[in-house]
Amino acid sequence: GGQGMRIAINRDEVAEYVQNILDLFPGNQILLDRFLEDAVEIDVDSVCDGDEVWLTGIMQHIEPAGVHSGDSTAVLPPFSLSDEVQATIRRYVEDIADALDAKGLLNVQMVVKDNVVYVIEANPRASRTVPFVAKASGIPIPSIATKVMLGEKLATFREQGMLESDLEGYAIKEPVFSWDKFPEVPKELGPEMKSTGEAIAFVDALTDDHFQRPFEM
């Protein structure tokens, strides 16, 4: 859930955070990543069978990168990514799946800054977004992924028409927060996850309040 992660905006903050960590956990390993300000975060779920990679969905976050993906509002399909960027995302996922020799579900988190795609992390497992994409698309993704892990090929499911999404318009994953149950928790969103659940909304157009609301917060 992003526990222990911090965003530092200058060298002094980096030094302060590092010292605080070392004071609490002497000898602890620390990972420093470059933070891309005002970047767009992307979640990609896919299923790999060793021969091909099926991208079940590319989700674009409304909140800027830096907010934990579990606390972000995600839109399926993406609403402002160019065809070129989406093609790059697809190629990166395929290359990662091949390098990892992935079989079954693979989640890749990325950010896009100035039309350049960066990979944050790749997880060869089910992610929290799989149920969202499955419900949004009407495709039994967990079942298909399980059968693929047991040896079946994606081509079999494609021939049966099982990989075709029936989503019309957009599906929006909205985080649910239980601030009333945890009043002591700061309400500012950041790299540590604070949501306790998720809801899904289906909209026909991006003028819908479900899409516009996060921009107004």
Features from the language model and the residues they span:
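ATP-dependent carboxylate activation and anion-phosphoryl transfer catalytic cores
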Residues: 1-217
